[in-house]
Amino acid sequence: YKDQVAFFHGCFVNYNHPQLGKDLIKVLNAMGTGVQLLSKEKCCGVPLIANGFTDKARKQAITNVESIREAVGVKGIPVIATSSTCTFALRDEYPEVLNVDNKGLRDHIELATRWLWRKLDEGKTLPLKPLPLKVVYHTPCHMEKMGWTLYTLELLRKIPGLELTVLDSQCCGIAGTYGFKKENYPTSQAIGAPLFRHRRERRGSGHHRLRNLQMAD
């Protein structure tokens, strides 16, 4: 493929849902774009940051920035990710929270759905089969923070036959590793309760659940 991107797969794709990464590659290939992995990838560091291990997170961030700089600066290809949390960390939390310099790289790191939308808007084509399905979509907090929700929604609306309902923007309550901790369970459930209720209501009317949410979103 003449056009290439580097894929920051993150921990969720690597350990929990590798099919998501495989599906993304199929979509990009169908658009005429090849996919490479970074020469070396570490966890984006958000779980470490959230639990106070900033020194360890900084070491991982430095490794990732070096690999991203190689992709962008040497190979001349952008970096995309399927996790909005990873994307937010690579672009904004590295310099602001960890004091890791990503100068010259930030604008070349994108969420996969935003990159896909831009390419379609520029004239690239993607063969999309009709998908007669009702879905509800929940936007993760970090995607909201970046202001990139619109790109994902517009991309979904391009799928023929897909009936999309967007839930009101609400935190799911998981907040990375916060909701996994026993002492935080009641608070986590209380935060997510309105969202859970809306999902149950839509499920009763035949809607399927669709989200960008990953473990650290």
Where are the language model's segments positioned?
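Iron-sulfur cluster-binding electron-transfer modules in prokaryotic oxidoreductases
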Residues: 1-217
